[in-house]
Every structure is written in structure tokens, then in C-alpha cells.
């Protein structure tokens, strides 16, 4: 009986919270401040299957999963559930990346093989990504597109380093059927005996073409970083490869940046309302401020009619699995709040992409010898020994007495963040409250922080490898806080019914 009561109480509180959000939302295109939104986050392939005909399994899926294809949900299914999401009170939907992917587990979209095209496995004959955007806008809802600037997958990138030809008509579960190596005899770079190599050597041969790991200058345009030493807790996280399926792009090379801007700019032109930028903490703030943020905002301004004239919103993931402080391990420049600010001094930046064509770069090449990266290194040196007390502060999230005041965003970078310090503290509301009260001044405007309890990556600490499972009462308290405190509330799909609580978070 107590369990039944608690579940009913949770459902009631959830309805109250979501209903409150629904009442506050006008569901018209004229919402001019993204802080009026509430976000529902879905992994599109795992949400709802609207077209069984496009279902596909991942190459590395075990036989036990064959009845549950990883690529099952699609744009058509998401459209079918837009009214459900709207009825919950959410005004915006954050969808995982939609570009073509290639890896053993690529259903999540973070292992790009072609940034310029939408992956066919999301689409149906009568439904494209444009259809999804249009259907959301018809309902007064907004689409936030997850994008990746930091890396590609490890199967090359069609327009930067073509390594395979993809046959979308073949069985996508069979890598040998759908992926034909682009070998030297055909004008490519992979070895002619590629298919005879063991998997580890195949991986090494692919990686060498992107990172010059065999001491040969394959990546002569330097589209990727070639740095090899990685540490989560220093600036090497900006240039090194964070995982085997995440090959680090040289975002400081204007040619790489311009290609990404052109590809993702096409989605702005289609009418997406904002970007969630993956792995932003693995890109220097200076690179965002010099390259990506101003360019995306320029395109968004030019095509604002596709969004009904409303501002374009961007927020990024600066992962900080750390409790008790908004400053990550005493390093302000690796902390989420750092990315919300413009630069406080001028740094040189070379916008000539041909500069990189003249450089042979290998793992041991000095970072300080490379334009733009040298400036990022200088920015790190200028801030790495500073404490939080030396950082700029803001009262933008605060009232002055009982009076509203217009926020001063003159030093805002134009990039907001996922509130990792709050996210990681949601096992205990007191911790969340104290973290915000003590740390909000370090953000340019903490009211723009996107706040969630758990996600496809992590739950709150210390059990961050599983979906939130601290009980219905704690969920209710968390929801109450998210929808009434500062910041933009975001709910990971299914949390409204405690879906998969305690389950291990997908590691694909």
C-alpha cells in the first residue's frame, strides 16, 4: 500500500510540475527567451518506432539483442509522440545527432562518418528531418539538435578522409556487406589487404590516416589533432582522443571549422531552434569564441525567419564529474562556467586554412609551434593557475532586493552550458541548493543553464553509471526543484515514469 501511495504521489506531483510548465508555455512561435522553454531529451533511435521498415541492428550487437534492433526509433515515431511530449508540458525537444554514423555501436549518433548528410536509418519514404522540424513547429514546439564538433568516428569522414563506401541498400548489421574499404588500388588510402587484417590492425590502419600515428603525413591538411597524451584534468583534453570511437578533430584549423560550420549551418537553415554541443569541454573556449559561436549566430540571424524570428540558443557539455564546487578540480578554465564568458584579453588567431597545409604534425610536435593552438595554450597558461576568486563574477541570476534588473550580458560568450555541478548533486537537494547559491556568480548568467537530473551519459554522483534510482520521493523533490528554480529544466525521456530506473546507462 505504501508503495502504491508513493507511486501515485509521484505521478500527481509530476503532473503538477508538468502541468505548471504547460500553463506557463504559450506554445506559439513568439517565445523570445529560451528560458521560457522546458526541454524533453530523447535518443531518437530508442524512443519510438514509427517505421519498422527502417530498423537496423548495430555491427557489434550480441545475438541476444537481435529482437531489439538498436536503430529502431526514428523521425516518424518521434512525430507520432510529439503530442504526448507537448501534453507533458514540454516546449522543446533535444534530439541526438542525426548525421551519418559508422561504428560498432552508433545508434546514439556521436560517431560521425559524414557530417553533410542525415543518416538514412532515421528516415522513412514520407518522413525526413525537415518533416520533424516542421511538425514540431506546427505545434509551437522547438527542436534542439545535438551536434558534435570535437570528433568523428574512427571509420573516416566522407569529405575529410574517405575510407569506405557505404551501401545503404545492404544489410546494415553486416559490416562487410554495407562498408566497402576504399583501398589504394581504387585510389584510396587504406591498404589493399585491409579485409585480411585482424580487427586491431584494421583500426590502426584507419587511425593512421587521420592522426599520422605511423609517422607518415597522411593527414596533410591537419583536419584532425595528432596529439597523443590525454588527461581529463589538464589542457591535453582539448587536443587528444577521448575514446577509440572519438577521433579528435583539429577545431583550431579553419578548414576543419568551416566544414563543420557549413554542415551544421545547413540545419540552422532548415529551422532548428538551437544546438546542444557535445563534448564542448574538449574544445578550448577560445576556439568557440573565435570560430564557432559567432559563425553559428551569424547564420542563425540570417535564417531567423525559419524559426519564426526567435533567437537561436546554444548550450554545451563541459563534463565535470565533481561535487561540492562549480570549479572543476581547482581549474576554472576546465569548468563549465568558464565557457559562458567572452575573452578578457585579445589572443591572435590565424583564419588562413592554407597555413595548416604547410605543417607536418605528429604526436610529439610542440603545440606551442602551431598557430591558434599556441593561442589556446596561452589562454590556458593565463588561467590555469588562477583560482575561482580571480574569475569574473555576475549578479545576473540574482534579484536586487525584490526588484528585477536587466541582466548585463555584454561579456556573455553566447554559449550556455549544461549545469554539471547541479546534475552531479541531484542525489540530495541540499547539495544542489548549496552548489547553486555558492557558485552561480561565476556563470555569466546561470538562469540560462540547462538543468537535468540524469542523461544518456551519467546519473548524479556517486552512482553515476546508472539511471537515477534514489527513490520516488527524491525524484519528486528533484522535479519540484528543476521546475521552480533558476535554469532551463530538461528531462531525459522516460523519467516521467521512472523508466529503467537503476539500469546501467548505455555505453555505446
Model-derived regions: residue spans:
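Structural recognition of the beta-strand scaffold that forms the well-ordered cores
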Residues: 38-43, 92-97, 114-117, 142-146, ...
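Active-site-proximal helices and loops of the catalytic beta/alpha 8
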Residues: 133, 137, 151, 262-269, ...
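Bacterial N-terminal signal peptides that target proteins for export
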Residues: 2-12
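Active-site region of glycoside hydrolase catalytic domains
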Residues: 36, 153-251, 351-412, 442-444, ...
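The substrate-binding groove and active-site-proximal loops of carbohydrate-active enzymes
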Residues: 62-76, 111-124, 242-257, 273-283, ...
